[in-house]
Regions:
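Extreme N-terminal basic, low-complexity initiation segments
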Residues: 2-6
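Detector for intrinsically disordered, low-structure N-terminal pre-sequences
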Residues: 10-11, 20-23, 42, 88, ...
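Short, positively charged and aromatic/hydrophobic N-terminal segments
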Residues: 8-9, 13-16, 20-22, 26-27, ...
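Bacterial N-terminal signal peptides
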Residues: 40-47
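N-terminal exported-region signature
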Residues: 50-244
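Sec-dependent signal peptide recognition
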Residues: 34-40
Length: 244
């Protein structure tokens, strides 16, 4: 068919900009200030209180704007969007994007066809905590708006032995272990890759420090994924609430 012929012609060579979090209160700076981060959605009979009052709900809904540069970068879905189907996560007409996923189920490639306005597999899921490569085949950056609920409660993200691509389950920028709770129970290496190139950060479990310039470890952005290399499996756990 015409569609299949077109897709066969899509050749891909083998191989962050800062996210902008917005809410009802305007732009939010680098560190997540949870009381101002969320465009709060109140569930059930909760009403909106006066501007001076502080009100919290069980579910907090927000959106994250991310610029995906031309070429390859490692991206993540920062919010729960229903079933986290790729067609919902990236929204309508995201541009000439191809998503490369590497996980327990193996390797998969999923492309968006701008002519037919559909993904190869629009039902494929990309949940918070997972990282994946994105190839933007266009000449300019593509702006994606992620919409959904902020993950809360007891969060757990499996880190297997060997290589995996992961991200923070919470839409927060910060030092990987100090701010985001990444486990440093053993020697671990983190690989980051974006428009500006790549960086490698290694944690020395004997000296209990990273090899970064300040010794405090890599900084990870909102909706940024990264490679992790571990000698043994563990879980990246975190107890999080937007009311903190």
């Amino acid at each position: 068919s015409k569609k299949n012929e077109k897709k066969l012609q899509k050749g891909v060579d083998d191989p962050q900009r800062p996210c902008q979090v917005r809410c009802a209160y305007g732009n939010i700076p680098n560190k997540m200030r949870t009381k101002a981060l969320i465009l709060t959605a109140f569930v059930g009979a909760l009403g909106i209180a006066g501007a001076s009052a502080q009100v919290y709900s069980v579910n907090a809904v927000g959106y994250v704007n991310k610029s995906i540069p031309a070429g390859f970068s490692i991206v993540a879905n920062p919010l729960n969007n229903g079933g986290n189907k790729i067609s919902d996560v990236f929204g309508a007409n995201p541009g000439s994007l191809t998503v490369y996923r590497f996980g327990d189920a193996g390797f998969s490639i999923n492309s968006y066809d701008t002519d037919f306005e559909e993904w190869d597999d629009g039902d494929a899921t990309v949940a918070p905590g997972e990282g994946f490569f994105v190839l933007n085949s266009g000449d300019v950056a593509v702006n994606i708006t992620f919409v959904g609920e902020v993950p809360q409660g007891d969060l757990s993200n499996g880190l297997p032995q060997g290589f995996s691509i992961r991200s923070s389950q919470v839409p927060q920028e910060g030092k990987l272990d100090v701010n985001l709770g990444f486990p440093t129970d053993e020697a671990v290496t983190v690989y980051q890759f974006g428009a500006a190139g790549y960086s490698i950060s290694a944690y020395d479990s004997d000296f209990e420090e990273w090899d970064t310039a300040d010794g405090a470890g890599p900084v990870v952005g909102v909706a940024e994924g990264f490679w992790v290399l571990r000698a043994s499996a563990t879980n990246w756990t975190r107890l999080f609430s937007t009311s903190e």
